[in-house]
Regions:
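Acidic, low-complexity, intrinsically disordered interaction modules
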Residues: 10, 15-104
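Short acidic DE-rich linear segments
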Residues: 109-112
Length: 112
């Protein structure tokens, strides 16, 4: 699913009022959309936590799962990634997804 397809499908969607099944479908489509749009080569978090890994390559291990206890449903999508030193972390789209990282860089340039 591309970003444009995702935007069209969910233009009137409200996650706060969605049924569990609809939210699950929404989260799956978020995963699909970000995976279709691609990942960055290096980790680049805007947050302080794990910022020591900024600029480092990572291995994509798997999708994070609320069923496996990786995170809460509302925190999805996230992916489990692994750094060269063996540390595994949950990564948000803004840490590793091209779409989000590029958007953030554009927004930061507007204000700097």
């Amino acid at each position: 699913m591309t970003f444009a397809e995702f935007e069209q499908k969910y233009k009137d969607f409200d996650v706060m009022t969605a049924s569990f099944e609809d939210e699950l479908s929404y989260r799956q489509d978020q995963f699909d959309m970000f995976e279709t749009e691609g990942f960055t080569d290096t980790f680049q978090t805007p947050y302080e936590e794990c910022s020591e890994y900024n600029g480092q390559k990572y291995e994509l291990v798997r999708r994070a799962s609320y069923v496996k206890g990786d995170c809460d449903m509302e925190c999805l999508p996230q992916w489990i990634i692994k750094f060269a030193d063996g540390k595994e972390v949950n990564a948000y789209p803004e840490d590793i997804c091209k779409l989000e990282v590029n958007f953030r860089e554009i927004e930061e340039k507007k204000f700097n």
